């Protein structure tokens, strides 16, 4: 479920690892070994699980604790009861081009979700995203956008401005939280596509880590209609976000 909000999102960290029953941990480990055998590029890094969400008139507070990517992926693929589900926390960026196109990425074949459509983003990282003892989700979004699309949110020649705009909350079998910035790019659709294609070629030539295979540009006002024509798997929040964006354009908001 996507919520449109201007509130700042802050974290409260519990410095312990999430405890899982041994029989569930065994299933997760067996599943993970099977996935790595299919795709050696996978890495079982740290993931942060949201245990509680609170808010006041200005802020949203997320209490988090550690788990791992295997736990997250198992939950995504097979589902886990709410008590032990992985409510992972991520930060991302939704981009709008200068000429009014929503930018949605298509994950590369080497990722854990080939062809999946989603915005740029990823999990918070203790090595890079800490400010004053807590996670800064803007830093997460900036880091992921630079790694995945070679775009710098602070570069005025690429991005005009950005704001907190959306937060994804758990819904149905998807247990994730994702804080999503909205960024207005200086680039047009054609310019951003050219920029990305050059970056993708660079990653191929240097054996760099690729997240997205291509970008899809969906004209705001009819973005959901264009999205529905694509047969790719899609993150649940993508359609919900674009419904809000289409409505805003059609109502001149």
List where the protein language model places each region.
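N-terminal leader/linker segments that precede catalytic domains of diphosphate-processing enzymes
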Residues: 1-119, 123-143, 151-253
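Active-site recognition of the HExxH zinc-binding catalytic motif
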Residues: 147
